[in-house]
Amino acid sequence: MCTLFKRQVEHRPVEQILINTSREETRVAILDDGLLQDLFIERACARGLVGNVYWGQVVRVLPGMQSAFLDVGLERTAFLHIAEIEGARMDTGTFKPIESLLHEGQRLMVQVAKDPIGTKGARLTTTISLAGRKLVYLPNDSHIGVSQRIEDAALREELRTLATTVRQKDEKGGYIVRTCAEEGATEQEFLSDMAYLARLWDGIRHRAQEVKKPTLLYQDLTLAQRTLRDMVHEGCLLYTSPSPRDRSVSRMPSSA
């Protein structure tokens, strides 16, 4: 395994991650040197929808609002604006008329970008993105980018070069290097992410071919699973009660 880089830090607080799961809720506490820094709670009855991928059907197109409502199998129809439709923006910067892209009864794959609020349904996008540990996969794009939160220009170029080198020449889709790669990234970590995300996307596509009506194709990871993916790193102390890892590992990159 060849490490691209590893930042040196003179003193790094001992980080502790505590995960407590029950049927009702999951609680995650982040501590630095024993001091609470963050507390996250996810209730089973109110789990968010952001990141979920659905097979939806257009039920109404509104040219005046340049938007559409889709049935995705939820209690309320979901909202899709023209700006969230891939391929809708023209070279001039303006958008194609939504009625030229969508029609009632049309079926398409969408992802939740914003949870329902009050009487408003979920907001959708057709730009599908799937997150791994170090990379975000964009199956309908070919671009390789780097998180804008990584500001070091030289580091950004190193990460982009690594992702470009590792990606298979005939591989479809693009990637965005996640902010967490700023602390260190290896070729093997990128390869592991790419393999995991390719399997995940294949599963979603195959399910979309099988379903006959609007339905959920992929549910995003739970709070416990996201914590294992995003926050656990070398040197941190992890405490779980009970352990969520056995239930999570099948949906995580092999490097997790």
Report each predicted region and the residues it spans.
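Single-stranded RNA-binding surfaces
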Residues: M1-S241, R251
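Positively charged, low-complexity/disordered segments
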Residues: R245-D246, S250-A256
